Swiss-Prot record:
Entry's family note: Belongs to the SAICAR synthetase family.
UniProt organism field: Acidithiobacillus ferrooxidans (strain ATCC 23270 / DSM 14882 / CIP 104768 / NCIMB 8455) (Ferrobacillus ferrooxidans (strain ATCC 23270))
Pathway: Purine metabolism; IMP biosynthesis via de novo pathway; 5-amino-1-(5-phospho-D-ribosyl)imidazole-4-carboxamide from 5-amino-1-(5-phospho-D-ribosyl)imidazole-4-carboxylate: step 1/2
Signal sequence bounds: none
HAMAP family from the UniProt entry: SAICAR_synth (MF_00137)
Cysteines joined through disulfide linkages: none
InterPro entries: SAICAR_synt/ADE2_N, SAICAR_synt_PurC, SAICAR_synth, SAICAR_synthetase, SAICAR_synthetase_CS
Stated name of the protein: Phosphoribosylaminoimidazole-succinocarboxamide synthase
Molecular function terms, GO-annotated: ATP binding; phosphoribosylaminoimidazolesuccinocarboxamide synthase activity
Gene name tied to this protein: purC
Lineage: Bacteria, Pseudomonadati, Pseudomonadota, Acidithiobacillia, Acidithiobacillales
GO terms (BP aspect): 'de novo' IMP biosynthetic process; cobalamin biosynthetic process
GO cellular component: cytosol
Keyword Ligase among record annotations: yes
Protein EC: 6.3.2.6
Length: 240
C-alpha cells in the first residue's frame, strides 16, 4: 500500500490497516505516558525495543501453546497481527504487591502474593480504567462466562511461563496486564507484552527495570528496557 490508513492511535502504538481485512499492523511509538496522559515524553528507540521485545514474548508464548494474535515482525517498529474483536477488559496478575494494589489495600510494596492475585479492569480512559469483577463482565456483555474462564486460565498460564522465563534472566515478574480478543470464534491474546505493561525488578537489587522508572522520574528508562531485553536474549536493532 502506498498510503496506509491509521485506524487507531493510542498512547504507545498506532494501529494501521493492512492489505488483508483480517490483519493489522502495529506501529510502536517512542511516546511514553503516565498518570492518564498527564506526563508524556518521547524516549528515543523505545518503540524499537518494545516491538522486538513483544515479538520475542509472543513467539515464546505461541511455542508454549498460548494462542496469540502475533504473526510476524515486519521491521524495527512494526509487527503484523490478526485483527481481533477486542474484549474491553484488562486482566492483571500480581505476584508481588506494588502500584495501585499497595495503595488500595495498604500492602507493603514487594510483599510476595501467594497465590498470585488476578484482577479485572474495564478499558475506558474516560473512567480511568475502573476495577470490575466477573459478574460485571458477564452482566454488561463484555464477555461470556466461557470467555471469562478462558481469559483467567490463559492469564495464569502466561504468568507461570513468563515468571519462569524472567527468573532465568535474574528478573522478578512483579505484575503485568493482558488483553484478549476474538477471531473466528476463538479467543486470542492480543495487544502487546513489553516493559510498558508490566513490572520487572532485578532479582538481587530489586531495582525497577520497567515503566516505573518513568513514572517515578528515576531516568534510564530505555537503558533498563534494553538491559531486560539483553538478559532474555532479545535481538535488538543496532541503534538501540
Amino acid at each position: 500500500m502506498n498510503e496506509r490508513i491509521a485506524l487507531y492511535e493510542g498512547k504507545a502504538k498506532i494501529v494501521y490497516a493492512s492489505e488483508s481485512p483480517d490483519e493489522l499492523v502495529l506501529h510502536f511509538k517512542d511516546d511514553t505516558s503516565a498518570f492518564d496522559g498527564e506526563k508524556v515524553e518521547q524516549l528515543a528507540h523505545k518503540g524499537e525495543i518494545n516491538n522486538a521485545f513483544n515479538a520475542f514474548i509472543m513467539e515464546y508464548l505461541q511455542g508454549e501453546g498460548v494462542p496469540t494474535h502475533f504473526i510476524r515482525r515486519l521491521n524495527a517498529r512494526e509487527s503484523l497481527v490478526r485483527r481481533l474483536e477486542m474484549i474491553p477488559v484488562e486482566c492483571v496478575v500480581r505476584n508481588r504487591a506494588a502500584g495501585s494494589l499497595s495503595k488500595r489495600l495498604g500492602i507493603e510494596e514487594g510483599r510476595v502474593l501467594e497465590p498470585p492475585t488476578l484482577e479485572f479492569f474495564l478499558k475506558n480512559d474516560a473512567l480511568h480504567d475502573p476495577m470490575i469483577n466477573t459478574s460485571h463482565i458477564r452482566t454488561f456483555g463484555w464477555a461470556t462466562a466461557e470467555e471469562v474462564e478462558a481469559m483467567r486460565r490463559w492469564t495464569m498460564r502466561v504468568n507461570m511461563l513468563l515468571s519462569a522465563l524472567f527468573a532465568k534472566a535474574n528478573l522478578i515478574l512483579v505484575d503485568f496486564k493482558l488483553e484478549f480478543g476474538r477471531f473466528d470464534g476463538e479467543l486470542y491474546l492480543g495487544d502487546e507484552f513489553s516493559p510498558d505493561g508490566c513490572r520487572l525488578w532485578d532479582a538481587l537489587s530489586l531495582e525497577k527495570m520497567d515503566k516505573d522508572r518513568f513514572r517515578r522520574g528515576l531516568g534510564g528508562v530505555v537503558e533498563a528496557y534494553a538491559e531486560v531485553a539483553r538478559r532474555l536474549g532479545v535481538p535488538l536493532p543496532a541503534a538501540s
